[in-house]
């Protein structure tokens, strides 16, 4: 694996974490605070 390829993969992982982690935290917080009774 070339250093540039390693840097590219690392940037992809970092970008995914930067996007996914805040969205996951926000969804968990919203689902915890939103106590609407959902009847499916």
Swiss-Prot record:
Membrane topology term reads: Single-pass membrane protein
Q: Which domain of life is it from?
A: Bacteria
One GO BP on record is:
photosynthesis
User: Key word Membrane present in the record?
Assistant: yes
What is the annotated localization of this protein? Cellular thylakoid membrane
Keyword list (alphabetical) reads: Membrane, Photosynthesis, Photosystem II, Thylakoid, Transmembrane, Transmembrane helix
Q: Name one Pfam family in it.
A: PsbX
InterPro entries referenced in this protein's UniProt entry, alphabetically: PSII_PsbX, PSII_PsbX_type_1_subfam
Q: Which residues cross the membrane?
A: 11-31
Main location as per UniProt? membrane
- CC terms in the record's Gene Ontology section: photosystem II; plasma membrane-derived thylakoid membrane
**Entries under HAMAP family matching the protein:** PSII_PsbX_1
What does this protein do, in the record's words?
A: Involved in the binding and/or turnover of quinones at the Q(B) site of photosystem II (PSII). PSII is a light-driven water plastoquinone oxidoreductase, using light energy to abstract electrons from H(2)O, generating a proton gradient subsequently used for ATP formation.
Complex formation = PSII is composed of 1 copy each of membrane proteins PsbA, PsbB, PsbC, PsbD, PsbE, PsbF, PsbH, PsbI, PsbJ, PsbK, PsbL, PsbM, PsbT, PsbX, PsbY, PsbZ, Psb30/Ycf12, peripheral proteins PsbO, CyanoQ (PsbQ), PsbU, PsbV and a large number of cofactors. It forms dimeric complexes.
The Swiss-Prot or TrEMBL record describes its family as follows: Belongs to the PsbX family. Type 1 subfamily.
Q: What is this protein called?
A: Photosystem II reaction center protein X
Q: Which organism is it from?
A: Synechococcus sp. (strain RCC307)
| Primary gene name | psbX
